[in-house]
Amino acid sequence: MHSRGRQWNAYETFLLQNASQITSLESSLRSITYFLPGRFKDAELAGEAIYALVHLLSLYHDSVLFRIVYSHGTRDAKVANVLAGANIPKLSLHARYTSYWCAVSKRYGYAARALMLIEATQLLAEMVARRKLNKQRAWDAVIAIEVVKAFLRFTLVRTTQDRPVISPPLPQREFDPAQLERNPAALPMTWRGERTGCIRRSLASMAGRDAYEQLLSFTLTEQDVSAPPLLVRAFQNNMARFAESVWILRPCIYVILLRIYGARDPRPFTTSFVVELLARTLRTNALVPRGKSASNLPPPPTTSISLWLSVLGIENSFLDWLASSLSVQPRHPSLKPVSAVEGEEWTARKRSLWWYLLRGPVWYRWTRPKIAHFVTRTEHRRIIGFFGSIAKEYLPLIDEYYYYAAV
């Protein structure tokens, strides 16, 4: 056991000392997998296997780097020496929130790791299932994956005391690994407080501009001093809980309908899209104080577009509606996210609607013909034709595999 512990300590030290090179290698391997489909038989399976393996290794490296870099103490002298010469970045709000729940709830940590493990390997599992099983059994495997993911997401909601799921649920590698590869022998760039164990950057290692930026980094906002649970609001009513439940169950509903009706039938696509919009509408209405509804809220503040229309003497209800829709200001203060963590999650869920361009009738009748037409027109051009040939190889993959177009 002691020898195994020493081996892990040695690997962690190696990871810290070569973090930049390891990150570059991971990025290169991922890039290679994008060009593999269509190059040889089962190339997409080989490429996805490499991609999944690199993704899992990256998840492990992220956890190691986060645990070592942001811990107040370290058990290994070599690791401490590496960190003594590094410029430790500030902990992000997302990392504060997710690391807090990992620390206070083991169940959250297990569920979050299991969810990210499944998401890293789900496409590979689907490829294997479609090669080994018949069509209906392969769809059963996909349904099983989505049911397990839904269960894990409900577990995250429960362990965070009725808060929405934040993606990704674990801290990420949010700093440049090259920052960990400074030479401490040349100039000590940080010092560690003996009483608190906190790492601070040395003033002697800073230029004038660096010192100014370092002082700015210590400027605290309301979100910086808030307790991690306050970065995401808990559900205030049953409508909010139902909205999150609908959002979590949305992929399960879609996959079950795909198994019954097929990908070309409009019913799975329409149902999934309506459920997505229903979840968003319920969430918005749940945030509005009781006695009001989102449809009865006062209009948002006048935008610059509305002002220009008034100056030009143009009165048009459609243009006024369009200007109001383009406004990024919320129609009620409660609709504004309480932190960047909550706001980024809302934005990510809004962007997920773009994936419907790769699904169902929209994919087969509009998006796919457009891409195929582009590939045909550019196949004899040198640079554009190269990228067109890559896109051509992905068309049958999106037709066959669900997880190529899944959120």
Predicted regions and their residues:
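Membrane-embedded alpha-helical transmembrane segments of multi-pass integral membrane proteins
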Residues: E26-L29, T33, V54-V64, L115-A125, ...
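C-terminal transmembrane module of eukaryotic multi-pass membrane proteins
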Residues: N316-V407
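Fungal eukaryote-biased detector of long internal structured cores
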Residues: I50-L53, L57-L230
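N-terminal signal-anchor/initial transmembrane insertion module
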Residues: M1-K106, Y110, L117, I384-V407
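Membrane-lumen (extracellular) interface motif
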Residues: F35-A46, A125-A141, I256-T271, V288-A294, ...
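Hydrophobic, structured segments
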Residues: V157-L358
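Helix-turn/linker elements and helix-coil junctions of extended alpha-helical scaffolds
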Residues: Y60-I68, K132, T159, I260, ...
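Transmembrane alpha-helices of multi-pass eukaryotic membrane proteins
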Residues: A19-T23, K41-V54, A111-A112, Q136-K149, ...
